[in-house]
């Protein structure tokens, strides 16, 4: 055993010795590398001396102190050699070295554990440590600028990593702290240099993590050189060369071309652990020679841009335009998005994807690629040429227009308007193109056209500006002017960009776009005439801002036939809808026709200016398309009747322009798009008064997931939506209306709900302004994800009737027009809305929609005149005021609506408004909401189609949740009330309990801030058996709590 143990000890000792030898070898190797590097660096500076000095053996030559003093003299510019005394005596050498060290200390270079004796003896570790501190302080720290001269310098020994082993003085706590501080400062300076190197090499795909192993391949050196002069290095070739070749090439190029001294050799780097300090010393020379590169943070755009991308500066277009067209292919499918961001003026830039797929993406027809794919490059170049040349009428068909894929081909010219002057973002999907042919044409026909790009782009950008202005209705005048300019330009250019490409769009829907886009110049006069004080006349489908023609093809955004299209539609599509809604509001303010709003929609699809979430629209897409037809039909009923007739008229005028082949596709699409297309057609029929509504309704095509965000607010303002036919039409949604596509409720459904309930809701909005309205919109967003299906079904099932009179007033911009024509629209709505609704909506929706719209119109009519348009708008804008007004008017409204025999109470109105607005959540304080809905159950069955019945369960759940929240709130209020009751009230408690109803109402008044529900709401609340029992229980509980203390007192 002893022998074995002995052998084990010997073996361990041998292993330890071998390890020590390896460490020593590494240490010696590092010292040798540092010695060579530092010697070269010192000689580099000593050459400046007069006479020049040279170091052959650093450890020997530095012992007399002359080399050290000469080096410091060159680096600092101060005279030190005059103090040098040459002598062979050690004492004189120590004196020379001490003077040099004293100078360093005076220069705030704090040296740790380095004394003159060690330097005079030639201690390798301390000599290298001294030189490294000099390099770090006089070169690296000054270059990086991290540490000022006033801060102490770091003193890290180079190779050994410590100096105490060779120091004659043992380290003290103070010395250790100094070392720690020095190391920290050194790391900071090196880190700064590393950051500079990383910025220089990042764009070449070289990852530099440190100053050691990252440089072994030589690519980092080459990348730094290439950052300074790209012509000196070929990185592709470097990837194929060996490490030695790369290192040799880097050092040679740096020396020969950049005049950077060759401090390193390939052998110094081609080791397992390259010396960090040597590499830092060498790399710092690049920063020293080329300091102008230090602040450079930008990356070469040519290197960063994708290979397939091209940037084109449109100098001719105004900066305001900021047209940016981006064509992208998604998921291998030919899905393309054209973005023109004009909400804020970005630099005029056109981003065109050179991939062949992108052109095919433009062809949204049933044929996925068609001929556009073949001419993708040509298409890109043509678009760019058009943009640069500014040829207004020249949009050579890049791809031959196919019968179905002729979405880009203009109806007149028979050529595709592939030009990209898009006002807003457009998303095209190859699969969607069948149904989303509308989106194709609107964007490409008039919006994407770069014909006379300066003009077209300017106009388009102006329209985009319109859309952004639509978001801000306050800038109505400015947006009107821009819209007019855009409309005029669009009318000039739109004719070429026909909606024929809108294969999926129904002829009615397409005609509106076609007439506005294809025949924009021809129809623009009529449209303008129609638009005039009212919206565009039914005869023309073009959208006009006042006297100008704004042609917007929103149909492009919605593929109607396939429900899956919405799923495929990128987030930008939803954005597009959202933008369209905003633009609709703006266009309405400008008195633009729905077509113009649609156009903006198409443009806005990709724009991210609006609050609508792309994801929401996406989620909406599949169901939205399926239910879109049904729900849209119903909502269209509710949509302001005047709007629909105009849309119908426009739609009818447009169908001749649109190819019949596209009609079938368009029909389903139209159902989803019909809201806006209907609105446009109906709006044309009732152009005088329903142009605004028309714009509003079509602007939010359900399937297109056109944002109806503004739908709600407009409805509150009293927008009149006639039941729009299922066929797609061009329309502009007032920017007050907010439609959240994540609710799968079709746009048409919401719009028609507004149309039928227009009058009722109008009076309700003006008189009662339920807190529910504003609250519903907020809750809609909050519960969007949870209640997408419910909300969609509720919107489709629950058609809300907005006051017809309010349709124009609701649009803030239309208010001026409405003033003259508000009565006309109202009168027209009565007769015109049902016909238009019947024409375009499915039979069921036609029947139900007109009836409900008429009924809803009748009760609200008395109050509509009472409420001025401005007041309605104001109420819509201020949800809080609406809540209070509605609370106070709840009682009055219930009487009003009950009088006609419709059994509509303020609750019913509230329910309608909530449904109309996709009620995701009712206000906590409004007790009448729940009761109202139950009382109107029969009305829902009578007036709403089977779709509404299908969603009854969802509505009940919502009501129950609202009731529960209300009950909890009431309980809180009661508790607070009882806590506030005084002692004398305790004695009178029994009496108060007997008069529970009176107490309840009074109790509402007692707590400040808890009086949110109106008295009649409380009465209705009390009338419910469950609520009454619950309140009785609470009263009994409080009574017992109050009685027990008295019993205790009597016992005492």
From Swiss-Prot:
Gene3D superfamilies: Calponin-like domain
TM regions (residue ranges): 1027-1047
Phosphoserine found at: 537, 679, 724, 856, 925
Keyword tags: Actin-binding, Cytoplasm, Membrane, Phosphoprotein, Repeat, Transmembrane, Transmembrane helix
Stretch list, region Actin-binding: 1-288
Residue stretches of biased makeup (Acidic residues): 780-791
Location of Phosphothreonine modifications: 710
GO-annotated cellular components: cytoplasm; membrane
GO annotation terms (biological process): negative regulation of cell population proliferation; neuron projection development
Tissue: Expressed in testis. Expressed during testis maturation process and in maturing spermatids. In brain, it is expressed in neurons of the hippocampus, cerebral cortex, and thalamus, Purkinje cells, and also in the choroid plexus and ependymal cells. Expressed predominantly in dendrites and cell bodies of the neurons, but not in axons. The level of expression increases during the period of maturation of the mouse brain after birth.
Biased composition (Basic residues): 880-889
Single GO molecular function: actin binding
Calponin-homology (CH) domain span: 32-139, 187-291
Annotated region (Disordered), positions in chain: 148-178, 391-420, 455-545, 585-727, 758-929
Biased composition (Basic and acidic residues): 455-465, 472-495, 594-614, 622-651, 659-669, 711-720, 759-773, 836-849
Pfam family, one: CH
Record-linked SMART domains: CH (SM00033)
Segments of skewed composition (Polar residues): 509-529
Biased composition regions of type Low complexity, renumbered to the chain: 148-168, 792-801
Keyword Phosphoprotein: yes
Protein name: Calmin
């Amino acid at each position: 055993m002893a022998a074995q143990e002995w052998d084990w000890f010997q073996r361990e000792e041998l292993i330890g010795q071998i390890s020590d030898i390896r460490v020593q070898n590494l240490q010696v190797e590092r010292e040798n590398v540092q010695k060579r590097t530092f010697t070269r660096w010192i000689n580099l500076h000593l050459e400046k001396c007069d006479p020049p000095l040279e170091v052959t053996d650093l450890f020997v030559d530095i012992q007399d102190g002359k080399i050290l003093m000469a080096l410091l003299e060159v680096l600092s510019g101060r005279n030190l050699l005059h103090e040098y005394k040459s002598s062979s005596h050690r004492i004189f050498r120590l004196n020379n070295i001490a003077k040099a060290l004293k100078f360093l200390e005076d220069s705030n270079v704090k040296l740790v554990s380095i004394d003159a004796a060690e330097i005079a003896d030639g201690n390798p570790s301390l000599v290298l440590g001294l030189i490294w501190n000099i390099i770090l302080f006089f070169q690296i720290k000054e270059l990086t600028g991290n540490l000022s001269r006033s801060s102490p310098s770091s003193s890290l020994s180079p190779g050994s990593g410590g100096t105490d082993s060779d120091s004659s003085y043992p380290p003290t706590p103070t010395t250790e702290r100094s070392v720690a501080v020095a190391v920290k400062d050194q790391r900071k300076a090196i880190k700064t240099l590393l950051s500079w190197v990383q910025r220089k090499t990042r764009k070449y795909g070289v990852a530099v993590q440190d100053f050691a192993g990252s440089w072994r391949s030589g690519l980092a050196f080459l990348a730094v050189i290439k950052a300074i002069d790209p012509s000196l290095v070929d990185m592709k070739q470097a990837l194929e060369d060996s490490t030695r070749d790369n290192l040799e090439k880097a050092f040679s190029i740096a020396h020969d071309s950049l005049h950077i001294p060759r401090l390193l050799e390939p052998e110094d780097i081609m080791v397992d652990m390259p010396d960090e300090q040597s590499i830092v010393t060498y790399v710092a020379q690049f920063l020293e020679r080329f300091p102008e590169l230090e602040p450079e943070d930008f990356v070469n755009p040519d290197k960063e841009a994708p290979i397939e991308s091209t940037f084109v500066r449109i100098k001719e277009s105004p900066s305001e335009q900021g047209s940016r067209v981006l064509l992208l292919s998604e998921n291998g499918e030919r899905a393309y998005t054209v973005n023109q961001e004009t909400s804020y003026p970005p630099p005029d830039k056109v981003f065109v994807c050179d991939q062949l797929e992108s052109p095919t993406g433009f062809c949204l027809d049933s044929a996925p690629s068609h001929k556009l794919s073949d001419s993708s490059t040509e298409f890109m170049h043509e678009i760019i040429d058009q943009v640069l040349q500014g040829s207004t009428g020249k949009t050579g068909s890049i791809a031959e227009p196919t019968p179905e894929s002729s979405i880009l081909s203009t109806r007149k010219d028979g050529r595709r308007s592939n030009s990209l002057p898009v006002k807003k973002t457009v998303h095209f999907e190859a699969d969607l193109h069948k149904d989303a042919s509308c989106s194709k044409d609107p964007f490409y026909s008039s919006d994407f056209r770069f014909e006379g790009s300066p003009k077209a782009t300017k106009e388009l950008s102006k329209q985009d500006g319109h859309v952004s202005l639509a978001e801000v209705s306050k800038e109505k005048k400015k947006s009107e002017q821009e819209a007019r300019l855009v409309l005029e330009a669009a009318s000039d250019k739109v004719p070429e960009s026909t909606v024929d490409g809108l294969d999926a769009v129904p002829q009615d829907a397409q005609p509106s776009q076609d007439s506005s886009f294809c025949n924009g110049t021809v129809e623009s006069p009529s449209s303008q005439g129609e638009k005039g004080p009212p919206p565009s006349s039914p005869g023309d489908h073009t959208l006009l801002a006042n006297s100008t023609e704004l042609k917007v093809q929103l149909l492009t955004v919605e593929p109607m036939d396939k429900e899956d299209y919405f799923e495929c539609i990128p987030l930008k599509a939803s954005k597009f809808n959202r933008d369209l809604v905003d633009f609709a509001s703006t266009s309405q303010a400008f008195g633009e026709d729905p077509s113009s709003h649609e156009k903006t929609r198409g443009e806005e699809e990709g724009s991210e200016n609006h609050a609508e979430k792309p994801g929401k629209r996406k989620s909406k897409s599949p169901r939205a398309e399926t239910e879109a037809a049904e729900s849209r039909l119903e909502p269209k009923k509710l949509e302001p009747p005047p709007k629909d007739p105009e849309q119908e008229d426009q739609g009818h005028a447009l169908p001749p322009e649109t190819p019949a082949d596209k009609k079938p596709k368009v029909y389903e699409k139209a159902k989803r798009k019909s809201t806006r297309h209907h609105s446009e057609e109906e709006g044309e029929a009732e152009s005088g008064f329903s142009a605004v509504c028309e714009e509003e309704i079509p602007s939010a095509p359900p399937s297109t997931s056109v944002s109806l965000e503004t739908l709600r607010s407009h409805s509150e303002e009293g927008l009149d939506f006639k039941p729009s036919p299922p066929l797609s039409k061009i329309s502009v949604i007032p920017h007050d209306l907010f439609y959240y596509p994540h609710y799968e409720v079709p746009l048409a459904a919401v719009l028609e709900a507004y149309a039928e309930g227009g009058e009722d809701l109008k009076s309700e909005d003006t008189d009662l302004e339920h807190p529910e309205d504003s609250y519903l919109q907020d809750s809609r967003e909050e519960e969007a994800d949870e209640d997408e299906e419910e909300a969609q079904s509720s919107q489709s099932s629950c058609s809300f009737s907005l006051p017809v009179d309010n349709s124009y007033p609701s649009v803030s911009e239309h208010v001026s027009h409405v003033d003259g024509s508000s009565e006309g629209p109202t009168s027209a709505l009565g007769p015109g809305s049902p016909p238009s609704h019947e024409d375009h909506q499915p039979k069921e929706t036609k029947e139900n929609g007109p009836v409900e719209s008429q009924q809803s119109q009748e009760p609200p009519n008395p109050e509509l005149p009472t409420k001025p348009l401005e007041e309605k708008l104001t109420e819509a804008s201020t949800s809080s005021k609406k809540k209070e007004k509605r609370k106070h008017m709840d009682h009055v409204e219930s009487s009003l609506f009950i009088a006609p025999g419709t059994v509509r109470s303020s609750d019913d109105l509230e329910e309608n408004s909530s449904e109309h607005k996709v009620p995701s959540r009712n206000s906590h304080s409004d007790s009448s909401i729940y009761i109202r809905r139950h009382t109107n159950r029969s009305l829902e069955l009578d007036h709403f189609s089977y779709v509404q019945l299908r969603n009854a369960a969802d509505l009940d759940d919502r009501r129950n949740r609202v009731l529960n929240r209300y009950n909890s709130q009431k309980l809180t209020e009661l508790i607070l009330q009882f806590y506030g009751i005084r002692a004398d009230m305790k004695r009178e408690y029994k009496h108060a309990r007997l008069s529970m109803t009176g107490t309840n109402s009074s109790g509402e008044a007692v707590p400040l801030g808890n009086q949110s529900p109106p008295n009649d709401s409380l009465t209705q609340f009390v009338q419910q058996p469950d609520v009454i029992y619950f309140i009785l229980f609470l009263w009994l509980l409080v009574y017992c709590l109050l009685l027990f203390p008295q019993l205790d007192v009597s016992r005492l």
